[in-house]
Design a protein with these regions (language model features):
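OB/S1-fold single-stranded nucleic-acid-binding modules
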Residues: 1-15
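N-terminal regulatory/effector-sensing and dimerization cores
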Residues: 20-120, 146
Length: 175
């Protein structure tokens, strides 16, 4: 293993298996991965880069550890979470975990607004555009590889990255 682990290496080590499917890499400044497996609880050390997570399907009522207990709030399929770089997390699944993660290289968060989107944990929030783009990318990744599909997936991921760097609406903001 390299001296500095990527988000995906840390997640794979914690879950005990690699992502089901993934695209992107260090050269592109992002990596999108799907994680599916049955799990009880798991913990992640602080990740080197921020993470946008979409709860795709599987177990409802996933919780995260907050201060000294499991969160009252829970995630269901269709909700999103942002995990900032460096923050350790623990998760209570007790069933099938099915999430997609988008890692964005910290050095790609150039302006203040982009950095601000990833400076704190946001658990189980509604982001219809981010979720829709993620689901569409995911469905395309299971299609046969063609040059046209690759261009389409790249364009969708660029749109998702632009959306994330601009930032999903915060609670209380006008839509």
């Amino acid at each position: 293993m390299p001296e500095t682990w990527s988000n995906e290496q840390i997640i794979a080590d914690s879950l005990g298996r690699a992502a089901d499917v993934e695209i992107g890499g260090s050269h592109s400044g992002w990596r999108l991965s799907r994680w599916r497996q049955f799990v009880g609880t798991y913990s992640l050390t602080g990740l080197p880069d921020p993470l946008f997570v979409v709860h795709i399907s599987g177990k409802r009522n996933i919780k995260t550890w907050e201060r000294d207990c499991w969160s009252e709030r829970h995630s269901i399929p269709g909700l999103a979470t942002i995990v900032p770089a460096g923050q350790s997390t623990s998760w209570l699944v007790d069933g099938e975990l099915d999430v997609v993660t988008l890692s964005i290289a910290t050095n790609r968060l150039q302006n203040g607004q982009a950095r601000d989107q990833f400076d704190r944990m946001r658990f189980a929030f509604s982001d219809p555009l981010g979720v829709a783009l993620t689901r569409q990318v995911l469905s395309e990744l299971y299609q046969p590889e063609t040059p046209e599909r690759d261009v389409y997936v790249s364009t969708l991921v660029d749109a998702l990255r632009a959306h994330m760097l601009r930032g999903p609406a915060q609670p209380g903001e006008a839509s």
